[in-house]
Regions:
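Substrate-binding pocket helix/loop in short-chain dehydrogenase/reductase
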Residues: 99-100, 104-112, 235
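Short, small/polar-rich loop/turn modules that mediate ligand/substrate recognition or access, typified
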Residues: 187, 192, 265-267
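C-terminal substrate-recognition "lid" of short-chain dehydrogenase/reductases
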Residues: 82, 243-272, 277
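Residue(s) in the substrate-gating loop at a strand-loop-helix junction
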Residues: 155
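Active-site helix of classical SDR
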Residues: 123, 171, 179
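Canonical Rossmann dinucleotide-binding motif of NAD(H)/NADP(H)-dependent dehydrogenases/reductases
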Residues: 3-35
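Alpha-helical segment proximal to the catalytic Tyr-Lys
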Residues: 128, 184-185, 263
Length: 278
């Protein structure tokens, strides 16, 4: 029985850790050739090593998705290595929290750059490899010859807002509008586009800030996580399943929306939340 993504090429950003790494491993397990991007070379290489050690096929292409010309470089690397692109997953991101009245322009713009501008650039750069290829297939054969889709990562912070995250909320709600627009513009070429909005998932973005995880933003170390005082003693009391989700469970939402089982789903935002927000 063929795997879900046999003979498909998947490009996934932010895949060195957490949800992205879990998704990359599942895609590879299901037969995909995977292009692993991460800001840092070492975690990207670790994901590729894990895939290869399990018998899968992957390459790493590290770098910042916020660099203006990086999108074209990443997607060209995928085509050079594997000849095509079937799935693009816009997963890269981080948080840089602050209350509205204290947030700097730099904080605001940095988060919009990674969560909104970078996905826009990546999808635009994918057009020659996805939209135009599908268009040519339709002209020659009457229909696309291969499945193609885009999955954008959103958040319940975008859908519902979140205290201290006005920049992140704006970016994650903005990507929902981007998703719907892509679905409408590229649907005629058989290309689907969906979003997956995560709730409380156990990653370094939701761990205690006191653990000291950081990300480099223009030479500045930005602390990741949530202050222990804000986390409180019972972080799951508003989640019907009464627990956080794992990176693999979150990745399952990405896999589902990219899979043949979602072939008639486009423009949709799937909430992976353990039931929070219902």
């Amino acid at each position: 029985m063929p795997s879900l993504f046999s003979n498909q090429v998947v490009v996934i950003t932010g895949a060195g850790r957490g949800i992205g790494a879990a998704a990359a491993r599942i895609f590879a397990h299901e037969g995909a050739q995977v292009v692993v991007n991460d800001l840092s070379a070492e975690p990207a290489a670790e994901t590729v090593d894990a895939i290869r050690n399990a018998g899968g096929d992957a390459i790493a292409f590290p770098g910042s998705v916020t660099e203006p010309t990086f999108a074209e470089q990443l997607l060209q690397a995928a085509v050079d290595a594997y000849g095509k692109i079937n799935v693009l997953v816009n997963n890269a991101g981080y948080t840089w929290d602050g209350m509205l009245h204290k947030m700097s322009d730099e904080q605001w713009q940095a988060i919009l750059d990674v969560h909104l501008t970078a996905p826009f650039r990546l999808v635009r750069a994918a057009a020659p490899h996805m939209r135009e290829v599908a268009k040519a297939e339709i002209a020659a054969h009457g229909q696309p010859l291969e499945p193609r889709c885009i999955v954008n990562v959103s958040s319940t912070s975008g859908l519902h807002g979140n205290i201290g995250q006005i920049n992140y909320a704006a970016g994650k709600m903005g990507i929902v509008g981007v998703t719907k627009t892509i679905a409408k513009e590229w649907g005629a070429f058989g290309i689907r586009c969906n979003a997956v909005a995560f709730g409380y998932i156990d990653t370094r973005l939701t761990q205690a800030k006191e653990k000291g995880e950081t990300i480099d933003v223009n030479g500045q170390a930005v602390a990741l996580g949530i202050p222990s005082a804000a986390l409180g003693d019972d972080k799951t009391r508003f989640i019907p399943l009464q627990r956080a989700g794992s990176p693999a469970e979150a990745a399952g939402g990405i896999i589902l929306m990219a899979s043949p089982y979602a072939s008639y789903i486009t423009g949709h935002t799937l909430e992976v939340t353990g039931g929070s927000g219902i």
